[in-house]
Amino acid sequence: MGIFDKLFGALKKTKDNFSGKLRVLFSKNKLGDEFYEELEEILISSDVSYSTAAEVVERVKEQAIDGKLSDEEYVTNLLRSILVDILEESEVEPPEYPCVIMLVGVNGVGKTTTVGKLAHYFLSQGKTVTVAAADTFRAAASEQLSVWAQRAKVRIVKHEEGSDPSAVIYDAVSSAKAKGTDVVIIDTAGRLHVKENLMNELRKMDRVVSREFPEADFLKLLVLDATTGQNAVNQARVFDEAVELDGIVLTKLDGTAKGGFIFSLSSELSLPVLYAGVGEKMEDLEEFDSRAFVDAIL
């Protein structure tokens, strides 16, 4: 089963919620302002922010042909095109090698699991991978990552619990440089985005990578639980201010009925979703495909 098929299965809840409401809207045969107001309400109820929903509706108004609002197929295709455009406007090129990927985020979003899945993904692309256990505060975090590293068959760099996470990163990138490793993936401790001291620690890790491995393509990716909904955008805004994020990794995409916040990440913060988890298995994480995502929810 390809990622496209997995995506369709994972997004069934979102599709049922979003496209179901659209069908009801078309059945009412509303036109003009009434139609646009209800379309905006549908977008907002699917966790698209107010400002992004207003932007989508404005684009529909600008592009729609007079007399076509009652044509369900026409409006659906127009909406599809607009939503794809919003996501593609923030897209970035795939990383160049060598690259360092540092995963950040709050507790419980699945960062450590995502490190293992990303390691498997890059290994399947023929790349050499090292993972760094820089979550030195959570009990048994490095042991959990060791299990994932063993399953993915990649090298792990770790220190004792309570060690300085920046020291782990220093050792990992130094070793990767010496060995010619293609990809280093860094696991970090979960942190509340309101704790400034923890954010300062992230900035220190950022500086270590930039100083010790300047030739590497360095991506700082925020891991977001897709079931968080609109609050995910607030998390992204604060983490972006702290470390200038390069993109998003979504987990639990199969567990949400409201995926609309993804459009707000792109529209308001210019943050692309780079990878998405669509299941529990090691291989259930792939590059995010904007067009496939929109097709799956419409």
Where are these regions (language model features)?
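Alpha-helix N-cap/helix-start motif
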Residues: 4, 53, 72, 111-115, ...
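Short glycine-/small-residue-rich Rossmann-like dinucleotide-binding loops
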Residues: 107, 189, 225
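Conserved catalytic-core segment of NTP-binding enzymes
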Residues: 165-179, 194-298
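Primarily NTPase-proximal linker/entry elements flanking Walker-type ATP/GTP-binding cores
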Residues: 13, 17-134, 141-186
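N-terminal accessory targeting/assembly segments
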Residues: 1-18
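Short, glycine/acidic-enriched loop or turn micro-motifs at the edges of active sites
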Residues: 136-138, 161, 190, 228, ...
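Glycine-rich phosphate/diphosphate-binding loops and the adjacent beta-loop-alpha structural elements
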Residues: 62-65, 191, 244
